[in-house]
């Protein structure tokens, strides 16, 4: 069974064609700068043959039409006809309270999905455009929506409720939703496989660390709490997002800097985080390089990030009533031995010791703690596309 996994952003589309009988990748690609000058598609098939196509892609429909031509290209593609694709799995950022699991999209559910856009106005609209376009271009294929928020829908009410007047929850569904759920689910379940135990029997903290970062407490195989909230803004300080902060700072800054609602939103989401603190970059590789050369603000940004992770691990260990594994994933979690060491050294009070040789790896599954620790520290590369494809296959 062939499944096409699609992730539509505001100006990009990531895609991966998978044969789910072997869970193998036939090809993967990226269409970028959609609707912007210099748009292109870059694709590589499982033979290592790379296609780079530079042409005008005015909108998502044009991009997806071109992507389907690339997928069926005689030399660089992987199939002869799109009719071979049985289902398309779409990443959808926000499912609200109405979608607590993946669903096959029909006309009725599409209306409900469109209503969710007010909860994620930057992310859900392009996700929906992707679904509608694939329905039009591949009417034979089932369209499945896999939600970033779904894995966190099992959180207990006391974990997701905010202490604002309850009527706001009833009227506007203001609550903690959490994000990166597909990654947290894949990684926690894979960690359990590596440890040789049922995920339901383990207490796991997953640290998804990248330009956007979130931490989740996984117990009984589901998310019990997570660091992101109503939006992806709270939690850890991120590439350009503030993370947790006193909300009273918002009206204070709006008054002092004469900022409107959209302007303060832009500051908190696009100009803050480690970029705002360091004044250098939102890329942690740049910060590690600058810190190694003595840049104090870069070092401060890195220390703030590590400190936030350590605090969340401590809090979630208490919330779970114990801990079996801390799992690092995402671009930073998988590749930065420096950040992993900062975090794990902060947990040395538990008796955990780092295996320096094993920690000196990038992008591989590995246990980085020495034997005898009270819990296991490990790296598990995430694979959101595979998780989306699996959930799509289950529903079709």
UniProtKB/Swiss-Prot annotation:
Class of enzymatic activity (EC top level): transferase
GO biological process, alphabetically ordered: acetate metabolic process; acetyl-CoA biosynthetic process
InterPro entries: Ac/propionate_kinase, Aliphatic_acid_kin_short-chain, Aliphatic_acid_kinase_CS, ATPase_NBD
Molecular function as annotated in GO: acetate kinase activity; ATP binding; magnesium ion binding
Positions contributing to Mg(2+) binding: 7, 384
Residue numbers binding ATP: 14, 208-212, 283-285, 331-335
Pfam family, one: Acetate_kinase
Positions annotated to bind substrate: 91
The reaction(s) this protein catalyses: acetate + ATP = acetyl phosphate + ADP
Active-site residues from the entry: 148 (proton donor/acceptor)
Keywords in alphabetical order: ATP-binding, Cytoplasm, Kinase, Magnesium, Metal-binding, Nucleotide-binding, Transferase
Stated role: Catalyzes the formation of acetyl phosphate from acetate and ATP. Can also catalyze the reverse reaction.
Name this polypeptide is given: Acetate kinase
Species this protein is from: Desulforamulus reducens (strain ATCC BAA-1160 / DSM 100696 / MI-1)
């Amino acid at each position: 069974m062939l499944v096409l996994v699609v992730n539509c952003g505001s100006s990009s589309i990531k895609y991966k064609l998978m044969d789910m009988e072997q869970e193998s990748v036939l090809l993967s690609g990226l269409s970028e700068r959609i609707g912007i000058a210099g748009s292109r598609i870059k694709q590589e098939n499982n033979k290592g043959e790379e296609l780079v196509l530079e042409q005008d892609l005015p909108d998502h429909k044009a991009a997806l039409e071109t992507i389907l031509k690339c997928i069926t290209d005689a030399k660089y593609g992987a199939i002869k006809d799109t009719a071979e694709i049985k289902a398309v799995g779409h990443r959808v950022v926000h499912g609200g309270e109405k979608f607590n699991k993946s669903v096959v999209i029909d006309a009725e559910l599409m209306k409900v999905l469109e209503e969710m856009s007010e909860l994620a106005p930057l992310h859900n609209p392009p996700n929906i455009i992707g679904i509608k376009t694939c329905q039009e271009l591949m009417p034979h294929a089932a369209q499945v929506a896999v939600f970033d928020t779904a894995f966190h829908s099992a959180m207990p009410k006391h974990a997701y409720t905010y202490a604002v007047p309850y009527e706001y929850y009833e009227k506007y569904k203001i609550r903690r939703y959490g994000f990166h759920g597909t990654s947290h689910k894949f990684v926690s379940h894979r960690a359990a496989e590596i440890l040789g135990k049922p995920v339901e029997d383990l207490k796991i903290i997953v640290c998804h660390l990248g330009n956007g970062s979130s931490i989740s407490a996984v117990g009984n195989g589901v998310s019990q709490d997570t660091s992101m909230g109503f939006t992806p803004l709270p939690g850890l300080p991120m590439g350009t997002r503030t993370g947790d902060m006193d909300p009273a700072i918002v009206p204070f800054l709006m008054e002092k800097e004469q900022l409107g609602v959209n302007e303060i939103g832009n500051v908190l989401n696009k100009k803050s985080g480690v970029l705002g603190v360091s004044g250098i970059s939102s890329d942690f590789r740049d910060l590690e390089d600058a810190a190694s050369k003595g840049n104090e603000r870069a070092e401060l940004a890195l220390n703030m990030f590590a400190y936030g992770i350590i605090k969340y691990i401590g809090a979630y260990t208490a919330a779970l009533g114990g801990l079996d594994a801390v799992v690092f994933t995402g671009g930073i979690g998988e590749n930065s031995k420096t950040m992993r060491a900062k975090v794990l050294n902060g947990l040395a009070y538990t008796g955990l010791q780092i295996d320096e040789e094993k920690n000196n790896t990038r992008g591989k599954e590995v246990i980085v703690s020495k034997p005898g620790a009270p819990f296991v520290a490990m790296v598990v590369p995430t694979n959101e596309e595979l998780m989306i494809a699996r959930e799509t296959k289950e529903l079709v």
